[in-house]
């Protein structure tokens, strides 16, 4: 969990530099021999100062940019160009959910793209406490807040998400 809090700090730093990662997932987090997590693969990242267009989200063949399993509802919207740093917060929340529950909040890997988008945008994840009884209380609340469908109900930043993780760990 301390490593996860450090990942939140790293993402918060990239946000402070005006960069949205857009493809946060476990495969894009490396841990050094000293246990320091490093966020990698900023290949689809966007500067917050750049105007986002439909081409920023799709390839020539209409495929989404990013990994659907970790994608926020607003990023999954094929016509949506209005993403901000809370999209990365959502992806961090999915990573935390997966760490705690040993499964993703949604199973979209084998679904057709339109069905995966519907699940991401409409379905509610199972509460972590229904999957793993030891996960309840504050950590469950923190996790579910990070993966809220409505971004205005999520943490407003990776920094505030990381602070809540730190408070939880220190309590």
Where are the regions that the model predicts?
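C-terminal lobe helix-coil module of Hanks-type protein kinase domains
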Residues: 4-12, 16, 20, 24-32, ...
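Conserved HATPase_c
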Residues: 1
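Regulatory activation segment
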Residues: 37, 53-65
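Activation segment/activation loop of eukaryotic-type protein kinase catalytic domains
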Residues: 42-57
């Amino acid at each position: 969990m301390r490593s996860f809090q450090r990942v939140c700090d790293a993402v918060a730093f990239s946000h402070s530099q005006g960069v949205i990662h857009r493809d946060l997932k476990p495969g894009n987090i490396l841990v050094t021999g000293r246990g320091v997590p490093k966020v990698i693969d900023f290949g689809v990242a966007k500067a917050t100062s750049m105007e986002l267009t439909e081409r920023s989200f799709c390839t020539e063949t209409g495929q989404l940019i990013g990994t659907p399993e970790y994608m926020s509802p607003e990023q999954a919207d094929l016509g949506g160009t209005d993403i901000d740093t809370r999209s990365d917060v959502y992806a961090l929340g999915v990573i935390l959910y997966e760490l705690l529950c040993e499964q993703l909040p949604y199973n979209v890997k084998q679904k057709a793209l339109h069905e995966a988008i519907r699940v991401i945008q409409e379905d509610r994840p199972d509460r972590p406490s229904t999957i793993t009884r030891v996960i309840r209380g504050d950590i469950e609340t923190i996790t579910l807040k990070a993966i809220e469908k409505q971004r205005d109900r999520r943490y407003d930043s990776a920094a505030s998400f990381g602070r809540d993780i730190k408070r939880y760990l220190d309590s």
